[in-house]
Amino acid sequence: MYVTNNTALAGGAYRKRKKKFQRPKPRKRARKSKKPPKSENTYVQRFWKNPPRNYILKEPTKPISSYARWIPPEIVDVNNITVNIPNTITASRLPKTEFQETEVFKDARDQWYFPIRPSDGEHDTDVKVKKKWSLDTVLQFLQSSPKHIRQLLLTSLFGSLLGLILDTLFGGPWNLTSRLLRLIISVVPGGRILLTALDGLGYFLGNSANPIHLIENPMMQAFGNSIQKQISPRLAEDIIKAADEQIGGGFMRTIASILSAAASAGTHFTMALPAIPIAAVRPFMR
């Protein structure tokens, strides 16, 4: 008996011979025809695997002349064109809702439309006034300007009495500086109003080409009225005493002679004359 894959054993039994398992060797290069195209869309892969069979359209059996015919165009008169507009009123679907407006008083401030201005002194910038004169420049201008211009500016700003005293102080031969003026004002109670007025005068002088026109300026007139309301009755007398102590050189005698001449000429002062000693009321001789 011829056995190929089995082995004969005693007693007539047979035993199968086990074959060694051999793994199939992988191909180094796969066939390109069996590779699907690289595409992320699965529809393209399915289309490649199962291509449609009925994508070829059949030709029509009837000729075109049997169902197609030429229709001539209509001649339209351009000058007689009428447009029919239907007389339909289009209304909104939702009803119009009316809201009751809140009552706004005339003196109320609307915070939504008007910006909130910070408190006085914070973030204030001078945009319109870019050529403000310093205190030294204002003093130099008053000392070098003619007497009638200096008197007009000072009397319109400080009044007749105090303006006349400051005109004598600025126009005299005492070489007044801003440091000396601050020293005189520091002794006088309420003398800070003079620095405020001269500082405001620097604004007006920096914006005007001709200083004589400042007298006709309504803003200058309003500024002078506000300054004169804040001047105390004893300010002129205190300035005369402080200037005589700091400057000397017969300043009080000069003021006394000027005031006596003005009083004899019938000049009306808006304020009372300062109390000057009788010994000082005499003509000042240089």
UniProtKB/Swiss-Prot annotation:
Keywords: Virion. Residues 1-12 form a propeptide. The keyword Cell cycle does not apply. It is found in: Virion. GO terms for cellular component: virion component. It comes from the Viruses. Residues 14-36 have a biased composition (Basic residues). Residues 1-41 are annotated as: Disordered. Its main location: virion. Disulfide bonds: none annotated. Belongs to the atadenoviridae p32K protein family. This is Structural protein p32K. It comes from Ovine adenovirus D serotype 7 (isolate OAV287).
